[in-house]
């Protein structure tokens, strides 16, 4: 058996090709059934995300990566010549190491991102549900999850914000001790604000107000995160309630001005307000930063935080890579020891079968009245010849082919050079 990974990802393939070989839930079910029933594949897991499609499998002896690549191309009706330039292949320890790097976020578009581990776990769960995993692959994925946990525990690779939305929420958490006690006003209802709302919700934010030009779009966020919805003209009325204001609209002019904030601060009795403006052009007048108790951060401020955090993640990645190298080597040691156990068991079974076969013939000879000494001598001769037959042939072949190292190994194995 051999461990194998074949796949494409965001660095090797275009979005168009990644879409063509992605596995929808319906396709995944069919694909896992095909893998399970294949004569060439012992066990397999399919990982399919927007950034990668990968097949992790244990293939039977003599099966090459070409078999799995051909299967992938045929399954998705993609020409092999279209697929091949974007395919990468990892075997044995390289396959183990690749899976661990993927799960730890070391191979992600955003270095250290944690979402990929959940996607790997789901891919494994789907394969188990379809009885497509067993043996080495099952052990590999279980070990992989332990390694990912170790990397998250022993390094800070996922602890620094590297997206604008996440950086905005991280900033809010740093300034306000508990988001569960803070009111957040989100201005806008686009994709970035939706991500901000999700991060805030994950951080325990309980009071959320969404202000948007159209209420319909904002209502979707409100239902998802139990938020209050207001229109843009209603912002001055609700601004004094907000401790944190995060804004991202496509407005050509500022929505929140210095005077509006000044009035809100008076009504709040100058309790601090955090303004995070991630819009371009800006939604919040720059003069707001001149006010006492108003703290304004722009998208440029966040970008400098993100750039710093990316560098920090790169430093943490060095330690993470070392952990992955160590753990992948340990897993291969386990595989080799397992292979040795299987070989020893098979050798013992074969030897025992020889012994029983010859013993039965000898017992029959004794029962028929043959000379016991002659029967025992014949038994010992035949048993010796059968046991030395395979190593004798191997030594003859090695000598004939000039394979000195192989001959030395055989001699050591059978105790001639001990």
Swiss-Prot record:
Substrate binds at residues 49-52, 108, 113-115, 119. NADP(+) binds at residues 188-193. Transmembrane segments: none annotated. The record marks 98 as: Important for activity. The active site is at residue 50. It comes from the Bacteria. Possesses an unusual extended V-shaped dimeric structure with each monomer consisting of three distinct domains arranged along a curved 'spinal' alpha-helix. The N-terminal catalytic domain specifically recognizes the glutamate moiety of the substrate. The second domain is the NADPH-binding domain, and the third C-terminal domain is responsible for dimerization. Homodimer. During catalysis, the active site Cys acts as a nucleophile attacking the alpha-carbonyl group of tRNA-bound glutamate with the formation of a thioester intermediate between enzyme and glutamate, and the concomitant release of tRNA(Glu). The thioester intermediate is finally reduced by direct hydride transfer from NADPH, to form the product GSA. Belongs to the glutamyl-tRNA reductase family. NCBIfam families: hemA. Catalyzes the NADPH-dependent reduction of glutamyl-tRNA(Glu) to glutamate 1-semialdehyde (GSA). This is Glutamyl-tRNA reductase. It comes from Aliivibrio fischeri (strain ATCC 700601 / ES114).
